[in-house]
Amino acid sequence: MNRIGCHLSTSKGLHKTIEQCLEINADTFQFFPRNPRGSKSRLIPKKEIDKFLELRKIHNINKIVCHGAYTMNLCSDREDLRKLAVKLINEDMKKIQDMRINHYVLHPGSHKNQGIEEGLKLIVEGINKVDVSNGQMICIETMSGKGSELGCDIDQIAYIINNASIPLYVCIDTCHLFSSGIRLDNFDDYLDEFDKKIGIDKIKVIHCNDSMMPFGANKDRHEKFGKGLIGEQDLFNVIFNERLKDRPIILETPNDLDGYKIEIEEIRRNFNELRQN
């Protein structure tokens, strides 16, 4: 089945994430390269990176995902904040290159009452200043649509991808899709439209989260797997979809390591049962 893991902290050292993966039976994971609510980034010593690379090779932990800071806004109404976002993304590109990580998930941003059209243009303008010459894959995340948030429908994401001068990809988030009004019990209908307008091959990462908030609420509140208003079966409709095989599945549910281990085991068990039937 797809590689599966969760969001992990690197506060105790980048190499410690591999040990955490082994604890919870994960074969991938996601992390922040800097303070997710700010811009500060820890300088990671080469010795720590080398240890990380050694351990991930030994234990076959791959398709690791780096998630950009929440505070970066490529379509801010302030030019200084737009420039800062580009600067931080480029710094992150260099950092993940050193870690030999390709997948980078990015929230597209909020237009701050400038309007959807202007916001999308600013996102493209900023994205075009990012250096991905070493093969990094920037994955625009599907968003819930709260406030002036962009990226909450296929057409908006298609505009960004089709107008950018660098290759872009997509991370689909089950909670965000549900909250933005996408029915996951009819997920193949969504994939059909996505394939027509963007191409399913552009989907590179799956965030698997249940939702605390009701369908179409445009609010981003994650719940534990199968314990929210989406439910286990509709989440399986997404993560077990044949058209999305080989994409890393990342849990961002409100859990500690023990909770993530239980969810990962539950998902693997259901996948194996499905394969046997």
UniProtKB/Swiss-Prot annotation:
It holds the Pfam family AP_endonuc_2. Zn(2+) 3 binds at residues 176, 220, 222. Zn(2+) 2 binds at residues 141, 173, 207, 252. Binds 3 Zn(2+) ions. One of its GO terms (biological process) is base-excision repair. Its cofactor is Zn(2+). Gene3D superfamilies: Divalent-metal-dependent TIM barrel enzymes (3.20.20.150). PROSITE patterns: AP_NUCLEASE_F2_2 (PS00730), AP_NUCLEASE_F2_3 (PS00731), AP_NUCLEASE_F2_4 (PS51432). Disulfide bonds: none annotated. Zn(2+) 1 binds at residues 67, 107, 141. GO terms for molecular function: deoxyribonuclease IV (phage-T4-induced) activity; DNA binding; DNA-(apurinic or apyrimidinic site) endonuclease activity; phosphoric diester hydrolase activity; zinc ion binding. It catalyses: Endonucleolytic cleavage to 5'-phosphooligonucleotide end-products. Keywords: DNA damage, DNA repair, Endonuclease, Hydrolase, Metal-binding, Nuclease, Zinc. SMART domains: AP2Ec. It comes from the Bacteria. Its EC number is 3.1.21.2. The keyword S-adenosyl-L-methionine does not apply. It is an enzyme of class 3 (hydrolase). Belongs to the AP endonuclease 2 family. Endonuclease IV plays a role in DNA repair. It cleaves phosphodiester bonds at apurinic or apyrimidinic (AP) sites, generating a 3'-hydroxyl group and a 5'-terminal sugar phosphate. NCBIfam families: nfo. This is Probable endonuclease 4.
